[in-house]
């Protein structure tokens, strides 16, 4: 997952779409128990009821991209219908925010090293 920053938004909404934020909060809330994509999809649509509906494919794509990024863990179980992934958060909310800050700063230091160091030294 490539982080895209929208500074017009606040908090996690700077880097996540609304349904993605809801999905992560759900996984943080269940605290390591893990959830299938179906569980996450149902919870996201319950939480966003009246606003919009999110497709299960969008949830699966997001969860898999977060696994690829190293933000989520998964285990595979075999059940009715074949194999399915059970997703769990690798980081809690604070650790995820640190991860986002680290990724952003790493890229700023790579592309604008002098300017980034100067600005960081001025920030109090």
What do the predicted segments below correspond to?
Residues 45-59:
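Short, positively charged loop/turn segments that connect secondary-structure elements
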């Amino acid at each position: 997952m490539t982080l895209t920053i929208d500074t017009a938004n606040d908090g996690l909404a700077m880097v996540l779409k609304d349904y993605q934020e809801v999905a992560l909060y759900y996984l943080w809330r269940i605290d390591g128990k893990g959830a299938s994509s179906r569980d996450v999809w149902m919870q996201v649509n319950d939480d966003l009821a009246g606003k919009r509906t999110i497709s299960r494919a969008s949830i699966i794509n997001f969860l898999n991209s977060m696994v690829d990024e190293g933000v989520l863990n998964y285990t595979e179980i075999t059940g009715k219908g074949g194999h399915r992934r059970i997703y769990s958060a690798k980081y809690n909310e604070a650790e995820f925010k640190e991860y986002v800050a680290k990724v952003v700063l790493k890229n700023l230091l790579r592309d604008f090293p002098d300017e980034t160091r100067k600005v960081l030294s001025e920030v109090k």
